[in-house]
Amino acid sequence: MSRIGKQPIAIPAGVEVKLEGNLLKFKKGNLAKELDTKANVNVEIKDNNILFSPKGEDRQSRAYWGTYRALAYNIVVGLTQGFSKTLEINGVGYKAALKGKVLELSLGFSHPINYDIPGGIEIVVDKNTIAVKGSDKQVVGQVAAQIREFRPPEPYKGKGVKYSDERIIRKAGKTSKK
């Protein structure tokens, strides 16, 4: 029994939800998202709530039940509040700058790294922090992971790009014999 799937999703004011067959359509202002639920999950809209239930008692239907409820909830939260991830840059000479729709990173390589910002994502650079914001949780996480991947933090000095809430396990350096 899915504990997540059982919970109804309250539709906040300003968000329109339509159900067309297996397709859930969400809209708030000029933002619109769609969620294609599989045939083995029932979706109902009752009393300003979205309810999910499995069609069968097989394992696959129960697995999709909680998954699609979580995906729909993330869409509702993304349309109303949005998602954000914060990255920190540590290291001498490491810096980031925005140039239009391109994020330019200087991370100790012989050349700057230019990262094209995808649509629907807003990036704010403030000194050594990069804030990635957007309405799609998956895309925000993916963009933050791609930026971190250019120079992941190393365990000796902690230089590199890391999430603001990430803890780096530090290692001791070499010791000399005496």
UniProtKB/Swiss-Prot annotation:
Q: Which GO terms describe its biological process?
A: cytoplasmic translation
GO CC, any one term? cytosolic large ribosomal subunit
Could you tell me the keywords of this UniProt record? Ribonucleoprotein, Ribosomal protein, RNA-binding, rRNA-binding
| Record flagged with keyword tRNA processing | no
Question: What SUPFAM superfamilies does the annotation carry?
Answer: Ribosomal protein L6 (SSF56053)
Query: Is the DNA-binding keyword given for this protein?
Result: no
Question: Which GO terms label this protein's molecular function in UniProt?
Answer: rRNA binding; structural constituent of ribosome
The UniProt subunit note reads as follows: Part of the 50S ribosomal subunit.
Q: Which family does it belong to?
A: Belongs to the universal ribosomal protein uL6 family.
Give a short account of what the protein does: This protein binds to the 23S rRNA, and is important in its secondary structure. It is located near the subunit interface in the base of the L7/L12 stalk, and near the tRNA binding site of the peptidyltransferase center.
What protein name is recorded for this chain? Large ribosomal subunit protein uL6
Gene that encodes it: rplF
